[in-house]
């Protein structure tokens, strides 16, 4: 039986919204699987093994006695939690500096190649990342093969330090962005990866074709134009990961 509908009835919307997200990067997953992690003193709730388990965020917004981390707004949770990452034991002082800088280190049984490194800090609290990171890599003989000092400006911190044939990488955290805080690292990538979403993609064209006789299956093609207003990509003199574009 047919159901009568009004002329204005529309079973399908005239406009569909589709959001595209894509990643571009060079990451060595086998490095995370074989890395042997050590660190400076860590807090009682810290879990060092979680920095290389591919889970790159905290499972909750946890309350502590650190500065402004016991906010009575109903959003905070109590420890323990399933995903807490690595947390340094000492807190920074009034000036945001440590008496002794906390650190993370990873050693490998075989040589590794990484185009760079990515540190993922706690994104449940605003500005909850270190002021400065000193990254140093070493070869099989313990000789330093590269070092770079960087200054995080967000929870996802990319370190452009190409490192071939290294056996050990050391991250030293110099101070916190907010005084009286710990350093929290949710994840470490042995490589660099950039993510593009609706905020960084200016246009997208999707092309699909169909063979009416089903003799072949054509591949769909996607052309995306990214927002390069921050000049990360320079066509004449590309640097960093964009050398691979």
Region annotations inferred by a language model:
Residues 1-245:
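Assembly/oligomerization scaffold segments
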């Amino acid at each position: 039986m047919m159901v009568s509908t009004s002329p204005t009835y529309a079973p399908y919307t005239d406009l569909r919204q589709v959001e595209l997200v894509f990643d571009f990067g060079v990451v060595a997953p086998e490095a995370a699987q074989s890395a042997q992690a050590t660190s400076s003193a860590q807090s009682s709730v810290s879990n060092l093994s979680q920095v290389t388990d591919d889970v790159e965020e905290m499972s909750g917004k946890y309350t502590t006695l650190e500065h402004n981390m016991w906010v009575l707004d109903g959003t905070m949770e109590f420890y323990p939690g399933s995903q807490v990452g690595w947390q340094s034991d000492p807190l920074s002082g009034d000036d945001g500096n440590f008496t002794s800088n906390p650190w993370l280190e990873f050693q490998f049984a075989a040589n590794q190649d990484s185009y760079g490194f990515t540190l993922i800090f706690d994104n449940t609290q605003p500005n909850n990342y270190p002021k400065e990171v000193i990254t140093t890599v070493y070869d099989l003989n313990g000789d330093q093969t590269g070092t770079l000092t960087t200054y995080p400006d967000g929870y996802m911190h990319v370190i452009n330090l190409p490192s071939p044939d290294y056996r050990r990488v050391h991250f030293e955290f110099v101070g916190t962005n907010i005084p009286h805080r710990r350093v929290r690292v949710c994840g470490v990538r042995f490589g660099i990866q950039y993510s593009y979403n609706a905020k960084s993609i200016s246009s997208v064209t999707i092309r699909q074709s169909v063979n009416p006789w089903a003799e072949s299956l054509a591949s769909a093609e996607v052309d995306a134009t990214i927002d390069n207003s921050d000049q990360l990509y320079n066509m004449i003199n590309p640097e960093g990961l964009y050398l691979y574009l």
